[in-house]
Design a protein with these regions (language model features):
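Long, charged alpha-helical interface segments
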Residues: 94-96, 100-169
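Feature captures the catalytic cores and cofactor-binding loops of soluble hydro-lyases/lyases
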Residues: 1-105, 109-119, 123-124
Length: 170
């Protein structure tokens, strides 16, 4: 049982409302043992992996700035890391994230009015495939196996996957 008013108590109460929980911070993932931190975080905001005991995946992490190595570890774990302005967000806010539009909206629970509070870009271009695969590593393995099998069968590369692109040079 969690002490009233603590972070874990707040999380438990939000979970009872059956809504997705996002972790939000101004600077995220610095000075931490990132895999341990991601596992602890996803334990509270992720979803159980079917047929894998005591392991979760997914979740949403929003940070004003997310340390690159923490961002990558979140990707590996199947989480959606988003860098966005978090200055208008507070604990317990009900938000709507529109990833393909790059919008975060705050929802007034009384009027159901949605106010856009910030915009963001999904990064990298393969992030949606990574989430569907349950993580970046799963995607890389699945894409590689698919390519090898299709090659053996003398088929073209699959167009199902978003392929990574190299950044443009200035």
């Amino acid at each position: 049982e969690f002490k009233e008013g603590t972070g874990l108590n707040i999380l438990e109460n939000l979970k009872l409302q059956n809504i997705q929980i996002a972790y939000v911070g101004d600077v995220v993932g610095t000075g931490s043992s990132r895999k341990s931190a991601i596992n602890s975080l996803i334990w509270h905001i992720g979803e159980p992996i079917p047929y894998v005991p005591n392991k979760k995946t997914g979740g949403i992490i929003i940070g004003g700035k997310i340390a690159p190595i923490f961002f990558n570890t979140a990707q590996d774990s199947g989480a959606l890391p988003i860098e966005a302005d978090v200055s208008q967000l507070e604990t317990g806010d009900i938000i709507k994230i529109e990833p393909y539009k790059g919008l975060i909206k705050k929802i007034d629970t009384n009027s159901k009015f949605e106010k856009t509070i910030c915009e963001f870009d999904l990064k990298p271009s393969t992030i949606t495939d990574e989430i569907q695969a349950g993580g970046r590593i799963n995607l890389m393995i699945g894409r590689s196996l698919t390519d090898k099998i299709r090659s053996k069968l003398k088929l073209n590369s699959s167009t199902v996957f978003i392929r990574p692109t190299n950044p443009k040079k200035n």
